[in-house]
């Protein structure tokens, strides 16, 4: 299990902090009404000592093959009595429920996202003024300009264990709105995505993986965004520090795809150009008007500010097969790499505080 105390999102350390945003959420059904419509699931959950995934409006079950049962949790972790159970929402939407007493990015409360599974097996909705899922700011669009396949943008779960479990699949030649939080979101935090190579499925990409393939937490690129109270959207793209680690078998391998930020109205955007194009950039290089910056773990990145509610795009594109700058070979994301494999294992740990 990934602990928020130990795995701070790399972009959260570098993205600009913002103020407070006020929004009016649409009325949401009471928890009792929803439980009645899922009575069979509810009774089964009580007998098993867990709360079953409820499929409330906008919620998306993820990685359903594990003990998590669709909740946005580690595959070995159940939504058990007395625990908080985070969940994924549809693309462009944010989780609207979390522990009201968890107001800062500190362990262990930074994991208390989602619904509370009480001692009777009932799911409690803590924030009655918010829907289970609600629309983000809608100011960042993921565009897939690659011809080599669909692209999985995998959002980390926060508040939660920060694994990249929340899927947004962008078909070749299409686009999807990404979830952009305002300052009304938990602890005024931003959204964080791992951007996978075209052709890697959501099932393979949006889970904690291993060094056998450059996907999931080993994907080459990360991205993030949030909006402040002045309608400024901050959008970041950068290299994934895990991809650059000395133990990573492809740390010197240039990806077969690139990523860049563009704006529909460039007059409203500051920080352009902001791109990573492996046909001209080496590993851990970015092209930026400000020269780029280096974040936690040594991953270089660039940030664009879209003002006055303007929209920005995170575009994924193919790199020409002849790319060979700086002598680093290009990686086909579906290549089989013969190497020593490092695999991240999950282990859920219960911490008991002494009184």
Swiss-Prot record:
GO terms for cellular component: fungal-type vacuole; membrane. It is a single-pass membrane protein. Keywords: Membrane, Transmembrane, Transmembrane helix. InterPro entries: Beta-glucosidase/SUN-like (IPR053088), SUN (IPR005556). Its main location: membrane. Pfam families: SUN. Coiled coil: none annotated. It is found in: Membrane. The chain crosses the membrane at residues 6-26. Belongs to the SUN family. PANTHER family: SECRETED BETA-GLUCOSIDASE ADG3-RELATED (PTHR31654:SF0). This is Uncharacterized protein YMR244W.
